[in-house]
Amino acid sequence: MEKAIVLLSAGLDSTVSLAYGVRNFQVVLGLTFNYGQKASRKEIEHSKKILDYYGIPQEVIELPFLKKITKTSLVAEDQEIPTGIDLESAAAVKTSMEKVWVPNRNGLFINIAAAYAESLGAKYIITGFNAEEAKTFSDNSREFVDAVNHALKYSTLNHVQVVSFTQNLEKSEIYRLGVELGAPLDLIWSCYYGGDEMCGVCESCLRLKRARGGN
């Protein structure tokens, strides 16, 4: 089996992509990032539980500078994350995206992961992108992955490549796939906040609720 590493936030997409990936690759490391996001503690904690479930070691990458230069509500303590938005409204979803956008976040994550992958002799980086959010988050899109993979052919000697087994799926399809794969869906954290429980009203929580069929 080819070696791979996984970028894991403990959300639905990355967890299910990992569940699929372990059937195809030898996953040797999980990377979780702390860039000052409000859910960082929960993402790290739940990612560790998911990685432990699969017997994969975790490394937490600290990126404090990203919080310093980012002004959006995902990290800024003086800004409220949008809640209760209408997921069927393109305008509302676009506004929500702009309020939680972190500059080049996925680009940074992937390039850091590529350095780890090459050093570990791994050819693949497993990520959790999806078709639903790619409509507003351009760094979830197939075009983004294709562009990054083109660049990685030049920046890594072993031509590390990004793969996402959820890339072409809507959230509801990803949830069903997770059930089929026996993914530890009880361990996921899909909330923008870091409270004791998921808030249930931020965009990420609303998408998870809809994916579950309203439950």
Curated annotation (Swiss-Prot):
Q: Which residues bind ATP?
A: L8, S9, A10, G11, L12, D13, S14, T15, V16, S17, L18
- Coiled coil feature spans: none
* Pathway(s) of this molecule: Purine metabolism; 7-cyano-7-deazaguanine biosynthesis
Under the heading CDD domains, the entry gives: QueC-like
Q: Which Pfam families match?
A: QueC (PF06508)
Q: What catalytic reaction does the record list?
A: 7-carboxy-7-deazaguanine + NH4(+) + ATP = 7-cyano-7-deazaguanine + ADP + phosphate + H2O + H(+)
The molecular function terms in GO held by this entry are: ATP binding; ligase activity, forming carbon-nitrogen bonds; zinc ion binding
Mind telling me which InterPro entries this protein's record contains? Answer: QueC, Rossmann-like_a/b/a_fold
Q: State the EC number(s).
A: 6.3.4.20
Which free-text remark accompanies the cofactor? Binds 1 zinc ion per subunit.
Q: Which GO terms describe its biological process?
A: queuosine biosynthetic process
Which cofactors are named for this entry? Zn(2+)
The entry's Zn(2+)-binding residues are C191, C199, C202, C205
Q: Superkingdom of this entry's organism?
A: Bacteria
Q: Which UniProt keywords apply?
A: ATP-binding, Ligase, Metal-binding, Nucleotide-binding, Queuosine biosynthesis, Zinc
Query: Assembly state and interactors?
Result: Homodimer.
What family is this? Belongs to the QueC family.
Protein's job: Catalyzes the ATP-dependent conversion of 7-carboxy-7-deazaguanine (CDG) to 7-cyano-7-deazaguanine (preQ(0)).
Specify the protein name: 7-cyano-7-deazaguanine synthase
